[in-house]
Structures are given as C-alpha cells and as structure tokens.
Amino acid sequence: MRVLHVCSELYPILKTGGLADVTAALPPALAGFGVDSRVLVPGFPAFINAIKDKQLLINIPSRFGAEEINIFLAKISNTKIDIYVIDAPSLFARPGNPYADSSNQAYADNYLRFALLGWVAARISEGLDAKWKPEIVHSHDWHAGLVPAYIKASELASGKKAVKTVFTVHNLAYQGLFPMSVFAELDLPGIFLSMNGLEFYGQVSFMKAGLYFADKITTVSPTYAKEIQIYEQGCGLEGLLADRHNDLYGVLNGVDPQIWNPKKDSLIATNYSSTTVATGKAKCKLALQQMMGLAEKEDALLFGIVTRLTEQKGLNLLIEAIGEITSRGGQIVLLGSGDKALEEVFLAAAKKYSKSIAVQIGYDEEQAHRIIAGSDVIMVPSRFEPCGLTQLYGLTYGTLPLVHKVGGLADTVIDSSLENLADGTATGFVFDEFSVESLTLVIRRAFALYNRKTDWKKVRKTAMQQQVTWDSSAEKIYQIYKNLVRENN
C-alpha cells in the first residue's frame, strides 16, 4: 500500500509543535504493516538544506504567485524517508517560522503558499511521479486542508475515480481562515465556496475544506474526537463534525522510542530504566538543577513545564499557583515561548525566586529531554488538548504527568486517587475543573504523594510500564487505510 503524507513540519528538520513529531514517527510505524509512505512538504529553507540525492521531477510554470516551482524527490539525511519538496523560493524561502515573519505576523499570502501544497499533492495523486502513485493521500492540519478539495475537484473535472483521502486534525483551534476574496485565487470550482465547502461564516477555511472533502477524518485522541462535536470545543465546526461522526476516528498519538527512551537517550545526564529509575532520575535532577541555577536539593519536588506559552496551555492558571509550589519547597523549570505578557510574568517569577524557579524562553529540543528526565512531575494544565505528547514523554521517563482532564490527557493519564493507588493503576495527577482552585488542590496532592515515597515509586513504575509507542495507533490508522482502499477497488 502506498500512502502520501502531506504536512508542513517534520522532526527533526522543522518543528514548531507536536505535529512534527507525529509526521516523522507515523510513516516508520506504518512500515511495519507494509505501508510504503512518502511525505510532501513545502520547500522551507530547513527542508531544502536537509535533503540529499534530490531528483527533479518536474518544473511547473508560475502558479499561486510563485515565479518558479520545482518539485524534487529526495532523501532526508539519516532516515529512510522519501520526501517530495516543493521548491518555490518566492513563497517559501523566508525568515521567521513556517507561518509568520520574524515579528510573528502571519504571512499575508499564506493562503497561496498552502494552496500550492494542496494542489501539488493532488497532482502527485494523479501520477505526477510516474514511478510511484499513492493509493491514499493523508493530509495533516489546516496547512494541508485543501488537499482533499483539490483531489475532489480533479475527480469532478475528469469523471475518474480519485484516490482516497484521510485528513487529520491535530488542533482544531488553528483553522487557516482567510478573507472570502482569496477564493478566486485558489483555482477551485465555484461550487466549493458554499456552506458545503470552504465557506465559514463569511471567510474561507482551509480546515473546513479538509473536514468536508476528506473521505475519512482522524484526530489525535478518542476524547478529543468526542469533544470537537460539541459547542464548547467545536470551534464553530461542531455541526459538520457531528454530521460526519461515522467518518471520524480518534486515534492516540504515540512516542517514538528511537527518540524518547530513557534507556538510550544521549541528551540526558545518565540513562536509566524502570529498575534504575531512582538513581537515574536523581542524577538527571541534579544536573538540571545545576544547569538552571536552582538550589541543589534532591528532596525538592521539581515540576517541569515544556510548552507554548499561550492561554490554551493553562499558563494563566499556573501563574496563580506558583506560590503553592514555592511555599512547599518545590521547584519549577519552564521551557517555552509565545505570548509576550506570559513570558514576562514567568521571567519576573524566576527573578524573584531565583533558586526555586528557572525559565528558558524559546524552544530547545535537547533541553526538553533534560527537563523531562530531570523533573519529578511534568505539568500539562491545558484548557483543551487534542492529544498532547509531553505527558506521554513524562510517562516514558517516570516523570509523573499532572494534567487537566481533557482530550488526550484524559485518555492517557490515570489519577492517583485512593482507589487507583489501591489497585495499582495510577500513573499521575488529574484535575477536572479548569480553575486555579482545582489546580492548587492537585498540586497539593502531588506533594502529599511525594512525601509517601513507597507509593510514589509504585506510581512511577506503573507510569513507565504504559504502552505509549506508535504500534497500536499505527495499526488503527492502517485499518482505516485498508478499508478505504477496499472501497476504491
């Protein structure tokens, strides 16, 4: 079976969030089921610089505002992944991150940049590469939301059955919304600009295009698949998603054990397993305290936070709960960036409590590994969380997740309640209500369990025994593909 993944990020080359981890880990996991996967990405500088053995497939005349377009098939250094890269310098060779300039302002022509991505995916689905034609095209998030639309448009124009499409929602809150006027530049049938298409409350929505035109929809946890069908978390698309509930699947993300594995992680102070976790984590904790300038206290309960600094991630709650941690002798290490006001608040807290709180603004993959290995608790107090990978990394490293009961957090962390402690199923700490009071209470429970060393060690061992790799999830994705291919034959 041949599958083309279409995305804008791919670890370790280009990453702004968990999307990159998923698109890098899923193709190798699917290979175990006989799936031949390739990836299509925009020609951002990071990708252009990382590819090797590139072959020019085709040169395309000016389109979507691009002066020159070359489609390359290449390899990614140190991987077995075949990758198609759209080299269109006028659209993709820019400073800043993939979506915004160095001032964090979204590029005004993002609709053209990602329309080209979708359009090229449709051409590959039709046989642009004479030696490899996909049976499934699997697109990820709004950046690739037009992929199913272009494939459907091609099917309508030719009268020929198109390949089947899968669209994965990694975060419904990011929708790719643009003024209605841009539709004329997208080269799609006029009938697609309607409620039964891209139109979304007077705008064009790339996310809605994927949700409406894809044959099947997946999202990244069973709970999130339910949540997005109701008003509170549907982001205005709950009606469409409820209508398509029979085509909607919640499949948990997984952890890539080649990258996240305390037994062989070269980025942490010392390696450890579930049998050597006590001494291993103690060394990692001391190394983290030394690196971040915290007081070197082995008995201090150390809370790690690796996140985007946004309101969605629950950082507003955490600000109010800082005193609960420091007053009990706890420590905090935070790595992240985002909202400037939040950055300033956490930097001020670190200045005030310099031996108890350390803050590093920005994202550093190596530091993320060190924080997760060296912390006792990893905090993910998100208002909503489609899946979350950080808590899965925490489980893997014996760093107990403290999470809000939403989305994938609810699916992957079992609270250390009395009954769960008694039956040996507890793996972390869960709070139900999104409030400062609820977060404060669960922090107090974390301190209480930490003071009961025997129980803490049992929960940590159970956490590390959880099966959070891609094996099970990849099989579920494969079954979706298999059923679609069967329908098309």
UniProtKB/Swiss-Prot annotation:
Belongs to the glycosyltransferase 1 family. Bacterial/plant glycogen synthase subfamily. NCBIfam families: glgA (TIGR02095), PRK00654.1-2 (NF001899). The keyword Glycosyltransferase applies. It comes from the Bacteria. One of its GO terms (cellular component) is cytosol. InterPro entries: Glyco_trans_1, GS/SS, Starch_synth_cat_dom. This is Glycogen synthase. Pathway: Glycan biosynthesis; glycogen biosynthesis. The keyword Cell membrane does not apply. Keywords: Glycogen biosynthesis, Glycosyltransferase, Transferase. It catalyses: [(1->4)-alpha-D-glucosyl](n) + ADP-alpha-D-glucose = [(1->4)-alpha-D-glucosyl](n+1) + ADP + H(+). Synthesizes alpha-1,4-glucan chains using ADP-glucose. SUPFAM superfamilies: UDP-Glycosyltransferase/glycogen phosphorylase (SSF53756). ADP-alpha-D-glucose binds at K15. Its EC number is 2.4.1.21. It is an enzyme of class 2 (transferase). It comes from Francisella tularensis subsp. mediasiatica (strain FSC147).
